[in-house]
């Protein structure tokens, strides 16, 4: 419970909802006739409208990036380390916006929303959405908020991919792209991880072909296993060794149902906690969006060509122990930008926390991020 938020927090926040009546054409060939985006904002938009920052969330994230919804919240938003007074995304200087992506399960239109054609939840009938679709919907949200150009679009992991897509699709609408712990596209290994996660969900007897809402159930076991698998990939071997080693919770049980090792207990806890407020169909959609992200596909498999016409400056940050999106993947982006003489700053940060390092209060990371954003603030008069 938070009785008084820390002084460097944005404090208590409220969510907003934008409704769009104009159909949204999707990359898959279908369209959403009407949709809603839930979002939060932190800080104030300046008179010139030049200090807006769009934050894009990763696979399991949502619009609640910072602050607290009530004094009873146990934890703040997912990027509390980076959003707030005096932090890299300084809300004394910037107006920060974060929305829940289409297909999400925290208020934006998604599989659990009512399909206007049937009067029932979309379920398996919700269209496949891509990073490009998300960016298009975010551009409409920017229009709704009166933001012609973002000072920066920022995100880690899948959020960083959205920042890249913004730079490609709307080059004139952002001054900076902040791409953290990301990649130009998924490797075969990463696609494989996502497929195993999807199979865990779809093989759960309670999945019912994605129509489980109609049965009043949820494929919780499959979703928990998917989350357990994902969580392993977000941590480094060093971090897991330091945190758990081979520590036992007690004597060996010689039983499959019992939990012997501390790491088993941790993963089961993460899985069970995750299923409390995340939807299985959304997990399927988010992993597919990750798999399909490939800007080079429209340019004869030439990623450099995909970035040829961007106009923004780019900050690339990677973490030494991240093996899901290793530093080598960020350097691929770096080389593609340099090939076209695009302004770019890059830093590989020594960190033991693995892929999830972008969410953590690592001093060198926050210093580098803050220094860059300080320059952005001065550039836009914030």
Swiss-Prot record:
One of its GO terms (molecular function) is homoserine O-succinyltransferase activity. Pathway: Amino-acid biosynthesis; L-methionine biosynthesis via de novo pathway; O-succinyl-L-homoserine from L-homoserine: step 1/1. Its main location: cytoplasm. GO terms for biological process: homoserine metabolic process; methionine biosynthetic process. Residues 51-359 form the AB hydrolase-1 domain. It is found in: Cytoplasm. Its EC number is 2.3.1.46. The keyword Amino-acid biosynthesis applies. Substrate binds at residues 227, 356. The active site is at 157 (nucleophile), 322, 355. Keywords: Acyltransferase, Amino-acid biosynthesis, Cytoplasm, Methionine biosynthesis, Transferase. The keyword Amino-acid biosynthesis applies. PANTHER family: HOMOSERINE O-ACETYLTRANSFERASE (PTHR32268:SF11). Homodimer. This is Homoserine O-succinyltransferase.
């Amino acid at each position: 419970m938070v009785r008084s938020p820390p002084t460097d927090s944005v404090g208590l926040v409220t969510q907003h909802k934008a409704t769009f009546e104009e159909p949204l054409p999707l990359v898959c060939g279908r369209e959403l006739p009407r949709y809603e985006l839930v979002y939060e904002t932190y800080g104030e938009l300046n008179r010139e409208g030049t200090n807006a920052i769009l934050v894009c969330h990763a696979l399991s994230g949502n619009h609640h990036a910072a602050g607290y919804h009530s004094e009873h919240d146990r934890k703040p938003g997912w990027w509390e380390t980076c959003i707030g007074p005096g932090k890299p995304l300084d809300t004394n200087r910037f107006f920060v916006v974060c929305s829940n992506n289409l297909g999400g399960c925290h208020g934006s239109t998604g599989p659990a929303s009512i399909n206007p054609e049937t009067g029932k939840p979309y379920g398996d009938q919700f269209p496949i959405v891509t990073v490009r679709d998300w960016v298009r919907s975010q551009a409409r949200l920017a229009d709704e908020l009166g933001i012609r150009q973002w000072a920066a679009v920022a995100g880690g992991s899948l959020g960083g991919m959205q920042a890249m897509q913004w730079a490609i699709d709307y080059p004139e609408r952002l001054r900076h792209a902040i791409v953290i712990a990301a990649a130009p596209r998924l490797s075969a290994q990463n696609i494989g991880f996502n497929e195993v996660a999807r199979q865990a969900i779809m093989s759960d007897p309670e999945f019912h072909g994605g129509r489980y809402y109609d049965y009043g159930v949820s494929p919780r076991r499959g979703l928990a296993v998917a989350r357990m698998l994902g969580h392993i990939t977000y941590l480094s071997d060093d971090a897991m060794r330091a945190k758990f080693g081979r520590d036992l919770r007690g004597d060996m049980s010689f039983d499959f149902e019992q939990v012997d090792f501390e790491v088993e207990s941790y993963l089961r806890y993460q899985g069970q906690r995750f299923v409390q407020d995340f939807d299985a169909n959304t997990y399927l959609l988010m992993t597919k969006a990750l798999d399909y992200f490939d800007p080079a596909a429209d340019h004869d498999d030439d990623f450099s060509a995909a970035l040829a016409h961007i106009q923004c400056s780019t900050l690339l940050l990677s973490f030494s122990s991240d093996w899901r999106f290793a530093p080598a993947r960020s350097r691929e982006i770096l080389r593609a930008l340099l090939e076209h003489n695009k302004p770019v700053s890059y830093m590989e940060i020594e960190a033991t926390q693995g892929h999830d390092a972008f969410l953590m209060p690592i001093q060198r990371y926050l210093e580098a991020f803050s220094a860059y954003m300080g320059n952005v603030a001065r550039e836009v008069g914030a």
